[in-house]
Every structure is written in C-alpha cells, then in structure tokens.
A protein has these predicted regions:
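Boundary/entry segment of secreted carbohydrate-active catalytic domains
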Residues: 1-2
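Structural motif corresponding to the early beta-alpha repeats
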Residues: 6-108, 121, 157
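Acidic/histidine-rich catalytic cores of soluble enzymes
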Residues: 10-11, 107-200
C-alpha cells in the first residue's frame, strides 16, 4: 500500500525484516507469510521482483557441514521467494578467505541452489570479501554456467579491504561492473560524487 502511494509498482524484500522479528514467523509459517504478502501486493498492483537473503549461513565455507546447512537454509528462502512471486533471490558468498577454496565451494553451493528451482534466478551480489572482486566473482559464474544463476552488480560495493564507509582499498568499479554485467539478472545502481570529467 505504501509503495503504491508513492507511485512505486515493483518492490524488493530483505530476509532480515522477518528473521530479525521472529514473532512474525512464529505467527505464521513462511509459506503462509509468502502467500499473504503476495495477496497484498497483488491487491495494490505491485510486483514482487527480488528478495535479498542475509545471515542464513556461509555458502562458501570449507566446513562441509556448515556449508550444507547454509544450502538447506537458503532452499527454504527459495521456496518463500517463489511463493512470493519473485523472479530473483540474492545470496552472499562468504565463509572462506582462500581464493581457490572460496571459488570451489561457491560453485558447488550455487549449482545446488540454481538447480533446486529453475524458475527462480539465484544471484550473487559483490558484497564484501572475495565477492567484491569482479574478476573472481565472474570466474565463479563462468564455472557454474547455469542460466538462472547470475550476479547482482552493486555499483557502490567494490570494497576489497574494509567496508564501503571505511574502505582501505577499492576494486576498480568500472572494471568490476563490466566484468559482472554479462551475468546480471538485476543491478543495484548507485552514484555519489563525480569529478569534472564525469568519473565517479
């Protein structure tokens, strides 16, 4: 209702709105919640396009038990996303600092999730750590090579040392966007400051 009142016809969700308020999930199952939210959005002519999943386990972890638990957690959200009518679900690739292991673990997890429901896009955002390196994340995508698995390039999230607000080292944002766009199913377009030549 609020989105429609602002003239917004498509919205995205974030899992933390529900996992951080467990009373919501205690009152109704994820399945019922998804159906209820879909009904509300349809009543106002608003499309549910994407949901961002956070804090559901480390999909790139080298601890196999931990990684498999993360996959199971994300499968629940795939079911939820599909019932909600979303086209796309965003995940994070965290849990490993070694590039070779991170790549291998990420490919395994994404392959399972992407094949779990071929009608839903599973995308990775450059969201800290090794995933904020465009070259590394693009390499993961090329190895997964599944149509409904891709990226969500975030123009302001290419910090490879620190956090965006206190970043010690940035990956080249233009290079990163160029590397990730061939695999993109959605984008998080951000712009802040430009120099006299029009560069961010």
């Amino acid at each position: 209702k609020k989105a429609k009142s602002f003239g917004i016809n498509a919205i995205e969700y974030v899992s933390g709105l529900y996992t951080n308020h467990t009373d919501t999930l205690e009152k109704m199952s994820m399945s019922k919640l998804g159906k209820e939210l879909l009904k509300r959005s349809q009543d106002y002519g608003v499309d549910n396009v994407l949901i961002m999943i956070d804090s559901q386990g480390s999909l790139a972890s080298s601890n196999n038990k931990e990684r498999l638990e993360a996959i199971d957690n994300h499968k629940r959200w795939i079911d939820f996303s599909y019932k909600l009518g979303c086209e796309t679900m965003r995940v994070n690739l965290s849990g490993e600092d070694n590039l070779e292991k991170w790549t291998e673990n990420s490919v395994k997890s994404l392959s399972v999730l992407s094949n779990y429901n071929k009608d839903l896009n599973v995308v990775v955002e450059n969201h800290g750590g090794l995933s904020s390196n465009g070259k590394y994340l693009a390499n993961v995508m090329s190895k997964v090579n599944i149509d409904n698995c891709g990226t969500l390039p975030d123009f302001g999230n290419f910090c490879i040392d620190g956090s965006p607000r206190l970043c010690a080292k940035w990956y080249d944002i233009y290079k990163g966007v160029k590397e990730l766009m061939p695999y993109a199913h959605a984008v998080s377009a951000k712009s802040y400051h430009f120099d006299d030549n029009g560069h961010e």
